[in-house]
């Protein structure tokens, strides 16, 4: 049984602001099955063949889309100008534009007393998107720019295209007063923010600079020799006195300041250096004796820093400096290390106990990171007539790095009280 409904163009009666309701072209059955309807009236061919009840409902797409800006257009204060679509059918008339501009002049003290002529009202230019200009908002906590924007007032832009307009009765807008009406943050507050954001972190900055130096060397190309020499350079400490360093006093002071590290920083830097040397030894470049020699130097510096971490003390008195003997490589490095106190909860350990803890940590680092390097490093032997004349030098050349490592391990075990190995 078919239901007689009006034609698709028929609309229901409406009064006032009630939207017009249009009958949909497809019947309910065809729309539910997503099938193209024959659109016959009063019943489509498909419903007649299948003996279905054919009904045509009202379209859900009818009516005008409600706009939030339409409700704000008649408000007393408007913070910014709404975006205007490109279609000429939706452009507001001159009276609406004049009302909107009047609300702006009443809310801004710099625009009070300004009038608009009819020719100006029809030539006003609006930005396509008001959110692109942050200076239009009145609730900003600081200015995005350091000086007023290099733009003309709204009325001057409109009058530039109309040269025949008489501006004698129109008051000029004070751009300075309009700009200063926005709130701004004092310069001292901005300086405080910059000082907080640029505050360096001591430990992380040193480790990060060391890693950047290694990454910079690798980015230049596959050069294991350059990477090994970079590790040696980063781990080296200038001996005092050094003729090259003392020739420029400022260079010596700067080097001394840059090489001050704490024990944790030494451990992190040594780990990165050991990983870099391990990569070089795994590469085919390690077959070159010059590259292997550079790896020996880098490993020797790593062992020296571990030994210096054991010798580091919290505070050095004047008597300690006077009674100290000739400075060794580890002794010079130990002076560059800051031994921070170690806490267990709220209890600070004694200085001797702190050295024992650091020695135990160093033993673990040596076993985990340095021992694999020694197993991978090739052994050098003296060849030729020199080897035949002096056989003792041959054995000394092969064991110099291992002897250095044994001394560090022995120092750590002495602090732990385990005695000799």
UniProtKB/Swiss-Prot annotation:
**Record's superkingdom?**
Eukaryota
| Compositional bias of kind Polar residues | 1-16
Signal sequence region: none
Its Gene Ontology cellular component terms are: nucleus
Q: Which PROSITE patterns match?
A: ZN2_CY6_FUNGAL_1, ZN2_CY6_FUNGAL_2
Q: Which SUPFAM superfamilies match?
A: Zn2/Cys6 DNA-binding domain
Q: Which segments carry the region annotation Disordered?
A: 1-20
Extract the Gene3D superfamilies matched here.
Zn(2)-C6 fungal-type DNA-binding domain (4.10.240.10)
Gene Ontology terms describing biological process = aflatoxin biosynthetic process
Question: Which sections of the sequence are annotated for DNA binding?
Answer: 27-54
List the GO molecular function terms.
DNA binding; DNA-binding transcription factor activity, RNA polymerase II-specific; zinc ion binding
Its primary localisation, in coarse terms, equals: nucleus
Q: What does this protein do?
A: Transcription regulator of the gene cluster that mediates the biosynthesis of elsinochrome C, a perelyenequinone phytotoxin structurally similar to cercosporin.
Q: What is the protein name stated in its UniProt record?
A: Elsinochrome C biosynthesis regulatory protein elcR
- Species source reads Phaeosphaeria nodorum (strain SN15 / ATCC MYA-4574 / FGSC 10173)
């Amino acid at each position: 049984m078919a239901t007689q409904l009006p034609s698709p163009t028929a609309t229901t009666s409406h009064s006032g602001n009630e939207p017009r309701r249009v009958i949909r072209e497809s019947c309910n059955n065809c729309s539910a099955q997503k099938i193209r309807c024959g659109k016959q009236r009063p019943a489509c061919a498909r419903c007649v063949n299948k003996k279905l009840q054919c009904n045509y409902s009202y379209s859900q797409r009818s009516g005008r889309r409600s706009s939030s800006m339409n409700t704000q257009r008649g408000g007393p204060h408007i913070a910014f100008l709404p975006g205007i679509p490109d279609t000429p059918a939706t452009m507001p008339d001159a009276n609406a534009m004049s009302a909107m501009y009047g609300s702006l002049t009443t809310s801004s003290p710099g625009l009070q007393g300004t009038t608009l002529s009819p020719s100006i009202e029809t030539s006003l230019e609006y930005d396509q998107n008001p959110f692109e200009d942050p200076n239009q908002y009145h609730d900003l906590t600081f200015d995005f720019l350091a000086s007023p924007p290099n733009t003309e007032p709204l009325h001057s832009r409109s009058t530039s295209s109309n040269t025949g307009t008489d501006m004698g009765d129109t008051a000029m807008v004070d751009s300075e007063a309009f700009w200063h009406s926005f709130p701004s943050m004092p310069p001292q507050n901005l300086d405080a923010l910059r000082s907080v954001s640029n505050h360096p972190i001591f430990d992380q900055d040193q480790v990060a600079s060391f890693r950047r130096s290694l990454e910079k060397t690798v980015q230049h190309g596959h050069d294991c020799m350059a990477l090994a020499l970079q590790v040696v350079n980063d781990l080296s400490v200038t001996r005092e006195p050094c003729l090259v360093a003392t020739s420029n006093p400022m260079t010596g002071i700067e080097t001394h300041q840059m090489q001050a590290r704490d024990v944790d920083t030494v451990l992190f830097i040594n780990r990165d250096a050991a990983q870099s040397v391990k990569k070089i030894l795994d590469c085919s470049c390690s077959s070159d004796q010059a590259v292997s020699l550079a790896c020996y130097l880098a490993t020797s510096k790593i062992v020296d820093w571990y030994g210096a971490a054991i010798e580091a003390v919290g505070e050095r008195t004047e008597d300690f400096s006077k009674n100290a003997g000739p400075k060794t490589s580890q002794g010079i490095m130990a002076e560059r290390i800051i031994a921070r106190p170690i806490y267990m909860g709220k209890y600070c350990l004694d200085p001797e106990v702190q050295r024992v803890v650091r020695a135990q940590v160093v033993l673990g680092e040596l076993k985990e990171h340095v021992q694999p390097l020694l197993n991978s490093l090739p052994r050098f032997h003296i060849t030729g007539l020199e080897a035949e004349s002096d056989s003792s030098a041959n054995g000394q050349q092969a064991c110099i790095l291992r002897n250095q490592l044994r001394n560090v391990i022995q120092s750590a075990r002495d602090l732990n009280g385990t005695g000799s190995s």
